[in-house]
Each structure stands twice: as structure tokens, then as C-alpha cells.
Amino acid sequence: LILAITMGWIDVANISAIMFTGLGLLLTINITSGLFHIGFYDELTQIGNRRALLAAAKTAGNQYSLAMIDADHFKKINDRFGHDLGDQALRVIASCISKVGCGAKAFRYGGEEFCLLFKGKSQAEVTDCLEQLRQAIANYDMVIRDKKARPAQCAKGEKNRGASRRHSNLRLTVSVGVVDSSAGGSFEQLIKLADRALYRAKAGGRNRLAFA
């Protein structure tokens, strides 16, 4: 429409130039915004992706905590119920971790693994928030029903829990590995330490926190 109007006024140089400039700016803004979203946000969960995490790490400062979070028995969920429900489970977890508080920023690290970055916080300062998150996910009964009827939001799922017994329920849990910058090393090294703590949590029975 803008282009059509512009072409209609092509004989008026000033107006035509202004309209072409406006169209160019709008297209540039839309393309840039779209590319940024594709580059830094996870398509499935709509939270930051690994690239966004690494960008955030550059401004994390000298004091921060990391939590690596992994969905327990996720392969079994996919194998038993299919990838559609597996994707829904990831959206539920992403919704929950994006509301964790304590100033955290949530990211999908890859697969069923997520990361929380707490700038300016020590490990001790984020433990309660992470324990509340673990409990919130463990208390969330994901109702297995028709795909269109499934709630994608953590809070809505908790509200609806127990409303109907005609459907089977899936209990989600996560294991969490925690480290803070006092452990020393680069950001990538701290991620590895948090990952090791995460797998200790899994080895210890899952659905728990472990610390580096």
C-alpha cells in the first residue's frame, strides 16, 4: 500500500523521496528485529538461547551464579507420549524458570537443558529461589489431553491441576546444578562445573539441587 501510494506521487519529488525513505526505514527495522529474535531467542520456548546466554555473560560482572537445569527422564517422555507432548513439557519448564525471581535471566541451553543466570548473586542467595522452582515444577501435574487444550503456562497448569480426572497426568521434575563465580575460571568453565553438579543431582536420585 505504501509503495503504491508512493508510485502515485512519483512526479512530486519531495513527497516521493520522503515516502520511499519511510518505507526503507520500516523494512530495515522489521528485518533487523526479526533477525535479532531469530538469532537470540529459542523458537520453541520463546526464551533466550545459548547465543543470548553467552552475550549476557559478557556483562555479568565479577559476581554471578549459574544454574543448569535438566528435565528428568525426558527421553522416556518423548518415547512414550511423542515429541509434541515433549515439546509441551519443555514449554512448561521454560515458563516456570522464566518466573523464578532473584533477578534471574532464563535461557534454553539446548535439548532439554536450561540455564539461569543470576547477576550479582552468590550461590547462597539463589538457593531458595531454585528450591522453590524445583518444587513448583515437581508439583505441576501436566494433563495429557488433546493438544489444543493443553495449557502452555506454568501458573495456568497449576490452577487447573486436579480439575478433571478423565485425563492421565504427567509429573515433571528437574535436576539442578549450581555454581557461582567464586569457583573461579571462565564463564565456559563455570558452565562445565554447573553441568557436573547437575549430573551429580541426577546420580543422587534426580528432582534435586546439587552444588559445585
Identify the residue ranges that each predicted region occupies.
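Signal-transducing coiled-coil linker helices
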Residues: 5-43, 51-65
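Conserved nucleotide-binding and Mg2+-coordinating catalytic segments in signaling enzymes
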Residues: 37-55, 69-83, 91
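Conserved metal-coordinating catalytic motifs of nucleotidyl cyclase and c-di-GMP turnover enzymes
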Residues: 45, 67-70, 111, 194
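Hydrophobic framework residues that shape the active-site pocket
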Residues: 74, 93, 109, 114, ...
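Active-site-proximal alpha-helical element of nucleotidyl cyclase-like catalytic domains
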Residues: 85-105, 113, 132, 139
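Short beta-strand->loop micro-motif that forms the acidic, two-metal-ion catalytic signature
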Residues: 97, 113-122, 152
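Catalytic core regions of nucleotide second-messenger enzymes
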Residues: 108, 138-174
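Catalytic-core segments of nucleotide cyclases and related cyclic-nucleotide turnover enzymes
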Residues: 127, 161-169, 173, 179-211
